[in-house]
Amino acid sequence: PPSSTLFPSTTLFRSHIHFSPVLQKTPHATEAMFLMMIRVFDGLGYRRYEWKCDALNSRSIKAAERLGFKFEGIFRQDKIYKGRNRDTAWFSIIDKDWPNLKNAFQSWLNPENFDTDGQQILSLTEIRNNQ
């Protein structure tokens, strides 16, 4: 009967991730996030991947947007953090976004998208917007 059936969660929340300064803002960091997304959508079959952060954390917000997470809103006074009310910004990628986003990551990670100094030719955002 439905009342005794347990349904697995179809959402995965990206908890805290901390890259060392050596890895920050490198193609390897972007590839690591891409590999996590492959696992979430292709490997585990989730429908939704969430990114939540302090609404004052501009670096986290910028990273979420660059990686293709879409802003969904602010949970006002979601938590108390370091003695202050913390508003939480919510972002997500859903399964219908995944095929185009996956193609954008694959195009961005292609060695032909990097010059001889290892600098990107097109940004991930530019590739996503040109699809």
Residue ranges and their predicted role:
Residues 51-60:
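Conserved beta-strand-loop-alpha-helix junction that forms the acyl-donor binding cleft
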Residues 64, 91:
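Conserved active-site tyrosine of GNAT-family acetyltransferases
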Residues 99-131:
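Acidic/histidine-enriched, glycine/proline-rich intrinsically disordered or flexible terminal extensions
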Residues 16-27:
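A short, internal acetyl-CoA/4′-phosphopantetheine-binding micro-motif in the GNAT/acyltransferase core
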Residues 24, 37-41:
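A conserved short alpha-helix in the GNAT/GCN5 acetyltransferase fold that borders
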Residues 42-52:
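Conserved GNAT acetyl-CoA-binding A-motif
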Residues 1-12:
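Short, small-residue-biased leader/transition segments that mark boundaries at the very start
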Residues 70-84:
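Conserved catalytic-core motifs of GNAT/GCN5-like acyltransferases
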